[in-house]
Design a protein with these regions (language model features):
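Short, flexible, basic/aromatic active-site loop/helix in glycosyltransferases
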Residues: 66-108
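Conserved donor NDP-sugar-binding/catalytic core segment of glycosyltransferases
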Residues: 31-80
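Glycine-rich, basic loop-to-helix element that forms the pyrophosphate-binding segment
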Residues: 1-14, 31
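A short, conserved alpha-helix in the catalytic core of glycosyltransferases
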Residues: 110-127, 133-151, 157
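Catalytic core of nucleotide-sugar-dependent glycosyltransferases
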Residues: 159-160, 173-199
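Active-site donor/metal-binding and catalytic loop motifs
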Residues: 124, 149, 156-173
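Short aromatic/hydrophobic "clamp" motif used to bind/position activated sugar donors
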Residues: 19
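The conserved acidic donor/metal-binding loop of glycosyltransferases
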Residues: 23-27
């Protein structure tokens, strides 16, 4: 599992000042990049939302469903067998209501690898992703360092969301998860602003 190393290489290869992050197991809505670009602010990173879809819905999903964006509708997901839950709020099309929900949600705005964005200069200042980390909370650890550097987080989970496809995680192991938890704890408690195990 070398996600952090790959992401750091991609960051250095990138030519834009503002970077948007997602994962290969996620389907962005049609306004994904536009929303991140429009809401970008100095001294902030954006924390988008994700909607985990079931194994059944993931298997039934087609390219046509994605291109038409029908897969981002409550009617479609319920018809395909997606369980009812609070995640459906993230599919609201009314941007005013989505903005209100983002302001009211008690959910902390963390840096999530499936849907986040930040200024490249801020990420480089924090020395990118910590390459000691494997699967399990590696993305939000970068967010903690950004916070420690004075970069605030903006909640946009209802204004832009991605569908998260179902899949197994054979790469997940308890030892790595425990190690990651300790690194995150250290980052928070010691107010670490830059990792020694990142880009440089």
């Amino acid at each position: 599992f070398r996600k952090c190393k790959i992401l750091n290489a991609a960051i250095m290869k990138s030519s834009n000042d503002y970077l948007v992050f997602s994962d290969g197991d996620c389907i962005p809505d049609s306004n994904f990049l536009e929303t991140h670009s429009r809401l970008a602010q100095k001294d902030y990173f954006l924390s988008g939302g994700h909607f985990p879809i079931s194994e059944r819905v993931s298997n039934l999903l087609t390219i046509k469903d994605i291109k038409s964006q029908i897969c981002f509708t409550k009617k479609y997901l319920l018809k395909q067998g997606q369980p009812i839950g609070k995640n459906y709020f993230k599919l609201i099309k009314n941007q005013f209501l989505a903005d209100v929900l983002d302001r009211l949600t008690p959910t902390r705005a963390t840096f999530n690898g499936n849907n986040s964005s930040a200024w490249k200069s801020d990420i480089i200042k924090a020395n990118g992703f910590d390459e000691r980390m494997e699967y399990g909370g590696l993305d939000c650890e970068l967010g903690y360092r950004l916070n420690n550097n004075g970069i605030k987080s903006l909640q946009v989970r209802n204004r832009t969301t991605v569908l998260h496809l179902y899949h197994t995680r054979p790469y997940k192991n308890k030892d790595a998860v425990k190690k990651n938890r300790l690194i995150r704890k250290s980052t928070i408690e010691s107010k670490t602003t830059k990792t020694d195990f990142g880009i440089n």
